[in-house]
């Protein structure tokens, strides 16, 4: 098989990326050497690959800084309405290649490195992923930042600069082991510390009454130090800011110790304050009411709101004087988007500032708060909803608890007015949950304190209205909206799949990265044998590239002409990696039963992290690895079936996986996955989907037509009906000999001969405690997979479907999503106008 072209080779051909200009290449080389000498203080004799990466990153950043400053000047001069995106997670991945692409300097940088005898791909591999997120929610925030900059919105991301991001996953003896992700150990060339904007954040203390009103006193103070990260728009000279807060101990730390003479202890205790931004909580779709997590949430909200108000009050660039001294226009100038309930303390915090510090009336402050804030819900799983114990809030944020109580009191009065004598409805709609330990329901607070509430796919938004938030929908239907998620086509096609990007550009030009709906024009070539051949060639090159990575990293040799069947996402019971595993075992049993039968070879890859405390998820990983061990070492199976668990799945690995996939597994139980965005990345890169009618799969099927996707399993209504009727897994187990054999193997120790009871608990879950109806969907899943195998053998048909998938991806650009948020929630208008480049105008 021919050796795949490297991305660098491919990019030397004429492509979307344009041609490197000689003068620019010379300039890049000059700046690169300057940074090597003056920033890193190295010469070529002692420089390492990492030094070269830092020199290149700084060179690229130099190209961005003028645009960054100019963009911020532009916002101060024009004073548009600002959008503030508040999120506890930003799963950014790497920045170097994305920045070069968005600035339009990729060819120059590659050529300059080539002339200096360096391979730019080796330099790119030196960059640490910025893993400040768990999964979908954090990656969505990152895609949104890219789109907000590309659409010219005056937008600011706010979050926390975790010293340790999502843990690095190692698989040892088939088990997940977590290692800390020390992503900052070599420094981060993209960020700029801003100590001059350091802000105080208070905790604990008590509330007193004064003639001016309530006052929060005797607090413990921590400082929030901002680090600014540039977010370049695509080819429009806009550079927005992601501001991440880091916790710093105050200078006048703990006088008690000084008075006791224990100076050393006082210095050591500074660490306690700084622990707030130490580490990202590694829970995805699971609420764990920890004190430190509550502090993180408030820390981010308190620092961010001070910054928002400072910027609102300042009238022009560089002004620190308060010029706007009335808050009447605040909602006309400020939109605050809460990414899930994690930043929902922004609502009581804004009320506290307006009432206690700015001395507005409650009514005025509440009107401003509601008109400024909007809330995005990301999950319907009850265990994921944030419900903070009152005792914790009382201790850490006593004033905020009072404010929440008052918000709830007025809210209950409104409910009573609209639905008199309905005590049960009042109980259901209260922010204060009284049964068991008293808790505050943060979703209820977010709905009441926002002017807009949205789900992230049509089916999810419908479920919110029909069940999860039905009472609130009946009370204020006008608040509820849908904003189907999207992905940035810059990272998820242009960056990760240059071969396919070039094929598309040859057919429809080069505007599609900002107008993804133009991909629909590809439909006319879906049956074209030449175009099919080219799409197949690019896919094969991407598969060879991934195969080489897998061989190098996992020591597994795979058959690159097999179907690459991939499921990558957080490991969670509702995502049903276990159902995938049942299919693998079924295929294995079929091969063993009749090794000569016609069989479509598959390489099945599963990747994702399990939360460290989630025992069942870790057992599922262990089972997948154990099954892989049996399958991959069975000579009868040979090349027909391989199973690989992809260790340490992260953004950078996703960029290598998505372009190489043939089949995308999106098999959550209907009604559990809010949207999903991995499904969109696979589709955009030409993989076909096997999936349930859940999340965005529903809209993907609508866009491409049911004949271009493999849909199976129960619908939301059918799941509901089965739940009502009563689900007995044994009925399915006894009725289907294939699934019976699979479960007997799992519980009998077939995959764990050294410990026959190792996976008995998994069989127990499947047969006795299965909340996600795996056996009810098993038969439909296996039949759908059989159809997948049959279709794959007809490559002309498969490629036609693949091209139709790509052509139907337009809706799922995060640009479309953000344009909808802008117009329908934030009240701002996207613009595709370019700002002048810094060199085109005089600098002030």
Curated annotation (Swiss-Prot):
GO cellular component, one term: cytoplasm
Record PTM text: Phosphorylation of Ser-15 converts phosphorylase B (unphosphorylated) to phosphorylase A.
Family: Belongs to the glycogen phosphorylase family.
SUPFAM superfamilies: UDP-Glycosyltransferase/glycogen phosphorylase (SSF53756)
Cofactor(s) needed by this chain: pyridoxal 5'-phosphate
Catalytic activity: [(1->4)-alpha-D-glucosyl](n) + phosphate = [(1->4)-alpha-D-glucosyl](n-1) + alpha-D-glucose 1-phosphate
InterPro entries: Glycg_phsphrylas (IPR011833), Glyco_trans_35 (IPR000811), Pyridoxal_P_attach_site (IPR035090)
Cystine connections: none
EC number(s) from the headed UniProt entry: 2.4.1.1
Molecular function, one GO term: glycogen phosphorylase activity
Organism ancestry: Eukaryota, Metazoa, Ecdysozoa, Arthropoda, Hexapoda
Pfam families listed in its UniProt record: Phosphorylase
Function: Phosphorylase is an important allosteric enzyme in carbohydrate metabolism. Enzymes from different sources differ in their regulatory mechanisms and in their natural substrates. However, all known phosphorylases share catalytic and structural properties. Required for glycogen breakdown in skeletal muscle.
EC class of the enzyme, as a word: transferase
Transmembrane segments: none
N6-(pyridoxal phosphate)lysine PTM sites in chain numbering: 681
Record annotation: effect of changing residue 642 to N: In strain: Canton-S
Positions with a binding annotation for AMP: 76
Domain of life, source organism: Eukaryota
Protein name as catalogued: Glycogen phosphorylase
GO biological process: defense response to Gram-negative bacterium; determination of adult lifespan; glycogen catabolic process; insulin receptor signaling pathway; negative regulation of innate immune response
Keywords in alphabetical order: Carbohydrate metabolism, Glycogen metabolism, Glycosyltransferase, Phosphoprotein, Pyridoxal phosphate, Transferase
């Amino acid at each position: 098989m021919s050796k795949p072209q490297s991305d660098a080779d491919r990019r030397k051909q004429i492509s979307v990326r344009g041609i490197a200009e000689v003068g620019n290449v010379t300039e890049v080389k000059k700046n690169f050497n300057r940074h090597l000498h003056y920033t890193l203080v190295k010469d070529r004799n002692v420089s390492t690959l990492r030094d070269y990466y830092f020199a290149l990153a700084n060179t690229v950043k130099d190209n961005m800084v003028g645009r960054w400053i100019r963009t911020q000047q532009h916002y101060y001069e024009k004073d548009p309405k600002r959008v503030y995106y508040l999120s506890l997670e930003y799963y950014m991945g790497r920045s170097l290649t994305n920045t070069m692409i968005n600035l339009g300097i990729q060819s120059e940088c590659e050529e300059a490195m080539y002339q200096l005898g360096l391979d730019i791909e080796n330099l790119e591999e030196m960059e640490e992923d910025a893993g400040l997120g768990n999964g979908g929610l954090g990656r969505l925030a990152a895609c949104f930042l890219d789109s907000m900059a590309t659409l010219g919105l005056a937008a600011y991301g706010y979050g926390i600069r975790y010293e340790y991001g999502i843990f690095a996953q190692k698989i040892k003896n088939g088990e997940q082991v977590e290692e800390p992700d020390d992503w900052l150990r070599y420094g981060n060339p993209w960020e700029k510390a801003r100590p001059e904007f350091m802000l105080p954040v208070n905790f604990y203390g008590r509330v007193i009454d004064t003639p001016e009103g309530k006052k929060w006193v005797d607090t413990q103070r921590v400082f929030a130090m901002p680090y600014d990260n540039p977010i370049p728009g695509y080819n429009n000279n806009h550079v927005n800011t992601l501001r991440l807060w880091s916790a710093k101990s105050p200078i006048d730390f703990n006088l008690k110790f000084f008075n006791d003479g224990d100076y050393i202890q006082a210095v050591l205790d500074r660490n306690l304050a700084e622990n707030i931004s130490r580490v990202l909580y590694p829970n995805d779709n699971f609420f764990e009411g920890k004190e430190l997590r509550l502090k993180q949430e408030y820390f981010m909200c308190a620092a961010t709101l001070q910054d928002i108000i400072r910027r609102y009050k300042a009238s022009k660039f560089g002004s620190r004087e308060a010029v706007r001294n009335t808050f009447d226009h605040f909602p006309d100038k400020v939109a605050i988007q809460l990414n899930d309930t994690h930043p929902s303390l922004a609502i009581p915090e804004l009320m506290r500032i307006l009432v206690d510090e700015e001395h507005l009336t409650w009514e005025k402050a509440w009107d401003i708060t509601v008109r400024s804030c909007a809330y995005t819900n990301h999950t319907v799983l009850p265990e994921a909803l944030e419900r903070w114990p009152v005792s914790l809030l009382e201790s850490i944020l006593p004033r905020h608890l009072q404010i929440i109580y008052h918000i709830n009191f007025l809210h209950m009065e409104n409910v009573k007015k609209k639905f008199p004598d309905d005590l049960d409805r009042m109980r259901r709609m209260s922010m204060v949950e009284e049964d068991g330990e008293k808790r505050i329901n943060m979703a209820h607070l977010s709905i009441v304190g926002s002017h807009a509430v949205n789900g992230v796919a049509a089916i999810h938004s419908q479920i919110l209205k029909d069940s999860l938030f039905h009472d609130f929908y009946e009370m204020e239907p006008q608040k509820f909206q849908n904003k189907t998620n999207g992905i940035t086509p810059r990272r998820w096609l242009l960056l990760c799949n240059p071969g396919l990007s070039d094929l598309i550009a040859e057919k429809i030009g080069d505007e599609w990265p900002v107008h993804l709906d133009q991909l629909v024009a590809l439909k006319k070539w879906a049956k074209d044998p030449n175009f099919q051949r080219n799409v197949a060639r690019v896919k094969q090159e991407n598969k060879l590239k991934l195969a080489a990575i897998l061989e190098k990293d996992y020591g597994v040799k795979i058959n690159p002409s097999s179907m690459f069947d991939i499921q990558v996402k957080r490991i969670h019971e509702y995502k049903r990696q276990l159902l995938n595993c049942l299919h693998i075992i079924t295929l294995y049993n079929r091969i063993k039963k009749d090794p000569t039968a016609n069989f479509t070879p598959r390489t099945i890859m599963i990747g994702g992290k399990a939360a460290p405390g989630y025992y069942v998820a870790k057992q599922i990983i262990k089972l997948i690895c154990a099954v892989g061990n049996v399958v991959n070492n069975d000579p009868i199976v040979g090349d027909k079936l391989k199973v690989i668990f992809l260790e340490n799945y992260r953004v950078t690995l996703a960029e290598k996986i998505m372009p190489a996939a043939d089949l995308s597994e999106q098999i959550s139980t209907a009604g559990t996955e809010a949207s999903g965005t991995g499904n969109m990345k696979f589709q955009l890169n030409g993989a076909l989907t096997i999936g349930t009618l859940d999340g965005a799969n529903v809209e993907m099927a609508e866009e491409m037509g049911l004949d271009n996707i493999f849909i199976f399993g129960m619908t939301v209504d059918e799941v509901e009906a089965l739940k009502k009727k009563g689900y007995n897994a044994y009925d399915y187990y006894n009725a289907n000999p294939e699934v019976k054999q699979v479960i007997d193997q799992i519980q009998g120790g077939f995959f764990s001969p050294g410990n026959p009871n190792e996976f008995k608990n998994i069989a127990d879950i499947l047969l006795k405690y299965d909340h996600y109806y795996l056996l009810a969907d098993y038969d439909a899943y296996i039949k759908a997979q059989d159809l997948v195998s049959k279709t794959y053998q007809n490559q002309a048909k498969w490629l036609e479907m693949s091209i139709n998938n790509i052509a139907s991806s337009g809706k799922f650009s995060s640009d479309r999503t953000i344009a909808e948020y802008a117009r329908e929630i934030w009240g701002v208008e996207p613009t595709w106008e370019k700002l002048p480049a810094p060199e085109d105008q005089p600098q002030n």
